[in-house]
């Protein structure tokens, strides 16, 4: 019964993820338009979403998300046999997937899922799901955020361009709640190594960093268990 319940929960999470991804660009276009109108109300243009500089990309059929997320939730519960811990871990992985997908396709990271990841990490520390205490989780999150924030501004000052995006330090804030400060060098090394490997294979001139940060979180967590 619980396996079926987790399959349904995963399916609902998949549907929610699909709608969030599918509506991300239209919502962003509308938000930019509304901000423009507020700044220049006397010069209100007619909004044409199809003429916007950034357009939505296909994100797959909603049924695939329902099935994929449902199976993921089910498999996690089958092996873990702990309802709350499974739910916490499954939602964490779902957030990482959404953040990675959006950054890979649009090179954009919304602070909203990153903040959800942050609070979810704190909740996990409070429930003793992670190796960190609540205070350690907070300290680590601030440290991760600070390091990425400094890297962002130093690279912008030194290279006159962004080596990291603004969304990356918001993502680092969320990731920091899952890893100790001691693991920061290993986490960065794995993320950079993954990025370099994919860069060599793909040959793309620019790669988003968030997918590698998310993968590095999973790998680093597995190594340090």
Features from the language model and the residues they span:
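A membrane-topology feature that recognizes alpha-helical transmembrane segments
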Residues: 1-225
């Amino acid at each position: 019964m619980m396996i079926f319940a987790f399959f349904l929960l995963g399916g609902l999470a998949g549907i929610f993820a699909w709608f969030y991804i599918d509506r991300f660009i239209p919502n962003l276009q509308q938000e930019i338009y509304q901000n423009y109108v507020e700044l220049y109300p006397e010069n209100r243009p007619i909004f044409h979403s199809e003429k916007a500089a950034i357009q939505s990309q296909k994100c797959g059929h909603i049924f695939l998300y329902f099935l994929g997320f449902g199976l993921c939730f089910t498999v996690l519960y089958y092996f873990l046999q702990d309802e709350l811990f499974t739910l916490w871990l499954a939602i964490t992985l779902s957030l990482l997937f959404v953040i990675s997908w959006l950054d890979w396709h649009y090179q954009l990271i919304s602070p909203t899922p990153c903040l959800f990841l942050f609070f979810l990490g704190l909740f996990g520390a409070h429930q003793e799901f992670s190796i960190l205490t609540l205070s350690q989780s907070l300290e680590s999150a601030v440290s991760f955020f600070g390091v990425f924030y400094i890297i962002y501004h130093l690279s912008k000052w030194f290279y006159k361009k962004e080596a990291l995006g603004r969304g990356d330090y918001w993502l680092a804030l969320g990731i920091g709640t899952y890893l100790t400060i001691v693991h920061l060098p290993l986490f960065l090394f794995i993320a950079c190594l993954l990025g370099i490997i994919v860069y060599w294979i793909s040959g793309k001139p620019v790669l988003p960093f968030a997918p590698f940060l998310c993968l590095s979180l999973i790998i680093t967590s597995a190594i340090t268990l």
